[in-house]
Regions:
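Short alpha-helical scaffolding segments that buttress acidic/His motifs in well-ordered protein cores
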Residues: 57-61, 132, 209-214
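Non-catalytic, polymerase-adjacent accessory regions of viral genome-replication enzymes
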Residues: 1-81
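Amphipathic alpha-helical interaction elements
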Residues: 46-49, 63, 67, 138, ...
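Conserved polymerase palm-domain catalytic core
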Residues: 86-89, 93-108, 112, 136, ...
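Conserved phosphate-binding loops in nucleotide/dinucleotide-binding enzymes
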Residues: 118-119, 123
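Duplex nucleic acid-engaging cores and interfaces of nucleic-acid transaction enzymes
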Residues: 124-132, 166
């Protein structure tokens, strides 16, 4: 079954904006994944550096804002020097297979219990590439996620989760479990994660991208250090990897 073949009823012949084109691509991927729980997708990498996908990724990264990474390049600076050139450079590097992510910049934010939560801030460039990759692979995993899962999911919200809890209470369910997995992001076993990703993705270039982000390292106090386990909090791709693990254990 070809992803490119067939037109969904009601869908326009041509999608005009990057957002519409990306949504059309995502719909095709989701439908294919939903139809077959065992299908592994192999032709994904070229879609990541499509112009419309990169433009939509930039729009989302810009909307999210955030600080600069280790290269000190800000969103504002990119806009001043030219977004089109910035994205063209990313596209060329990805197409040539020369993309290498930078280490994430370590920052700490206070937690309610007085402790500090470590965050890893990727460069804007890496956030755009991660967002582009997420746009392509997320629909595949979304087809597998549980209906009762609400965290970090498109078209899902905390309000919907609360409504589901209210409805469960009306049906006689009267227990709520509040749990926290200590050091979850820092202790994810990468090989386990990659095995889960490989269940749905066979495109080696996409698998390489994900592994590169996991192994990019952390810069703290001017020094770069390797990390042997975990995935940095703060990355665009991190919530998707988290959901993949939880879905597998559901």
């Amino acid at each position: 079954m070809s992803l490119e073949g067939g037109k969904r009823k009601g869908m326009p012949e041509t999608a005009k904006t990057p957002n519409e084109k990306v949504r059309q691509l995502q719909r095709k991927l989701w439908v294919c994944a939903k139809r077959s729980k065992t299908r592994r997708f192999h032709a994904l990498y070229d879609r990541i550096y499509r112009s419309d996908v990169l433009w939509e990724a930039w729009r989302r990264v810009r909307s999210n804002g955030g600080a600069a990474g280790v290269d000190a390049e800000t969103i504002r600076a990119i806009e001043q020097s030219g977004v089109e050139r910035f994205l063209a450079d990313i596209q060329a590097v990805l197409r040539a297979g020369r993309y290498r992510p930078s280490p994430v910049k370590r920052r700490y934010i206070p937690k309610a219990d007085g402790k500090q939560r470590p965050l890893g801030i990727p460069t804007v460039r890496d956030r755009v590439v991660q967002m582009a990759a997420k746009s392509v692979i997320e629909p595949i995993f979304e087809a597998d996620f549980q209906v009762c899962s609400y965290g970090f999911r498109p078209k899902k919200s905390a309000t919907q989760a609360l409504e589901a809890i209210r409805e469960a209470g009306n049906r006689g369910h009267n227990f709520v479990i509040d749990a926290d997995i200590q050091g979850y992001f820092d202790n994810i076993q990468r090989e386990t994660l990659m095995e889960l990703v490989r269940e749905r993705i066979s495109d080696r270039r996409v698998l390489k991208l994900i592994r590169q982000w996991l192994e990019a390292g952390v810069m703290e106090d001017g020094r770069v250090r390797e990390t042997l386990a975990g995935t940095p909090q703060g990355g665009v791709i991190t919530p998707l990897t988290q959901k993949a693990i939880f879905s597998s254990n559901a």
